[in-house]
């Protein structure tokens, strides 16, 4: 025994036993693999953030808003929304933040919200276009008719009448700096101009990010519904049809009036019972906040205006005919920003395996997470720099993030097919609509070289 170790009171060093050696080796390897993967993830995110950081240092006038990205996030099937939000918050949002870009996030807690949101935005643009066209025609008509009109004296009582709409408009437009003139210390800013409205090529305006295959499916369907569908929702005729069926089943004769009265009384009693039930439930939940909407209201809000089976047979509405048949642009009349139809799309898959039998694959993916992070951050960097934008190819880009569907639970897919779920249905696309779209697509060799 070494005398020095003996003087210190230390015994002889011995190698650990076989079992302890196996234990510490497995533990060190497991923890080392996790630590290395997490370290590489931080390095990857930091590298791509540093690449786009110079863009945020560019000069921007105070009356201009930065480029705005629209983000649609959908949860993976049979799982929580937080799974998709982690991908957004950890890997996509930092790149957009350090690039100095603005973004708007639309989250979905049930199927149909993204489709309904996209379609409603397109319909709102169509309504504004129709209103602007009508106002222009009305103003031109007034200018022509004003030549034949003679000026007449105004009634003093009419001049003194109070117009609440005019008062609200005056209050909104009033600014003390216009009254004080040179005595104001803060100069008055001009109208805020969005950077997306100043680009020469509409493909370089804004951008759309779909996190999840389900979000991408609903986005495509929402574009078709908003452009080809009607402006007004389908009429709710459930109660009318029920009443009509009762009246049609009546027999002609002396009992017609009695039958009609009975049917009406039944409908009234049903309405009163439902109203009382709603009132009682409202009293019980009077002080609760964040209460979910009724199922009937949800289904009514998310009900499509146009079925996907009718996309190809639906004629193009006249207000969007120059957009779909010609090279005209669909822009917001107020901001002059190109619509979502012309903005390029980036699709990010959400890999998510659940179940006991998938544990080995989940463990492997857990230790290889850095490759997925590198791919997502590279796509986000390409979104910021706008380097690789290609025209939408129906046969190719309809399958974006298709690999995610292999992770969907088979039982969930089977149930979705039976219930006619939007995600399990085949994605329908019309050439008239998708021919105006663009997508972010990196070259294939770039991804391979990085992974190798």
From Swiss-Prot:
Topology relative to the membrane: Single-pass membrane protein
Transmembrane segments: 20-36
Keywords: Membrane, Mitochondrion, Mitochondrion inner membrane, Protein transport, Translocation, Transmembrane, Transmembrane helix, Transport
A GO biological process held by the record: protein insertion into mitochondrial inner membrane
Compartment(s) of residence: Mitochondrion inner membrane
Annotated GO CC locations: TIM22 mitochondrial import inner membrane insertion complex
Domain of life: Eukaryota
Protein name: Mitochondrial import inner membrane translocase subunit TIM54
Organism expressing this protein natively: Candida glabrata (strain ATCC 2001 / BCRC 20586 / JCM 3761 / NBRC 0622 / NRRL Y-65 / CBS 138) (Yeast)
Designated gene of the protein: TIM54
């Amino acid at each position: 025994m070494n005398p020095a170790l003996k003087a210190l009171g230390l015994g002889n060093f011995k190698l650990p036993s076989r079992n302890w050696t196996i234990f510490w080796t497995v533990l060190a390897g497991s923890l080392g693999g996790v630590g290395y993967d997490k370290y590489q993830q931080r390095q990857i995110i930091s590298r791509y953030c540093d690449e786009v950081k110079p863009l945020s240092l560019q000069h921007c006038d105070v009356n201009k808003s930065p480029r705005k990205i629209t983000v649609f996030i959908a949860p993976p099937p049979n799982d929580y929304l937080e799974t998709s939000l982690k991908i957004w918050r950890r890997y996509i949002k930092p790149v957009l933040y350090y690039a100095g870009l603005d973004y708007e996030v639309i989250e979905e807690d049930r199927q149909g919200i993204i489709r309904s949101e996209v379609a409603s935005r397109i319909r709102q643009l169509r309504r504004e276009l129709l209103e602007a066209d009508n106002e222009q025609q009305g103003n031109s008509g007034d200018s022509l008719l004003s030549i034949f009109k003679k000026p007449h004296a105004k009634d003093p009582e009419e001049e003194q009448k109070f117009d609440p709409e005019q008062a609200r408009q005056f209050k909104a437009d009033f600014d003390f700096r216009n009254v004080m003139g040179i005595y104001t210390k803060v100069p008055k800013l001009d109208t805020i101009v969005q950077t997306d409205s100043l680009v020469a090529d509409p493909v370089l305006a804004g951008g759309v990010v779909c996190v999840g295959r389900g979000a991408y499916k609903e986005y495509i369907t929402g574009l078709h519904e908003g452009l080809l569908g009607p402006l007004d929702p389908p009429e709710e005729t459930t109660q009318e049809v029920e009443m009509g069926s009762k009246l049609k089943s009546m027999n002609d004769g002396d009992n017609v009036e009695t039958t009609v009265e009975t049917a009406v009384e039944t409908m009234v009693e049903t309405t009163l019972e439902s109203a009382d039930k709603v009132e009682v439930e409202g009293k019980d939940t009077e002080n609760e906040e964040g209460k979910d909407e009724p199922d009937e209201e949800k289904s009514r809000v998310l009900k499509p205006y146009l079925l996907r089976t009718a996309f190809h047979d639906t004629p193009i509405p006249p207000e969007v005919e120059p957009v779909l048949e010609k090279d005209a642009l669909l822009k917001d009349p107020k901001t002059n920003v190109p619509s979502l139809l012309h903005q390029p799309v980036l699709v990010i898959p959400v890999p998510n395996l659940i179940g006991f039998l998938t544990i080995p694959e989940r463990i492997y993916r857990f230790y290889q997470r850095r490759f997925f992070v590198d791919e997502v951050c590279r796509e986000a960097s390409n979104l910021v720099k706008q380097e690789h934008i290609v025209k939408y190819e129906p046969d190719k880009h309809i399958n974006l993030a298709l690999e995610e569907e292999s992770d969907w639970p088979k039982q969930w897919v089977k149930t979705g097919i039976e219930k006619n779920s939007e995600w399990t249905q085949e994605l329908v696309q019309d050439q008239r609509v998708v021919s105006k779209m663009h997508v972010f697509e990196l070259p294939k060799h770039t991804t391979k070289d990085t992974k190798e």
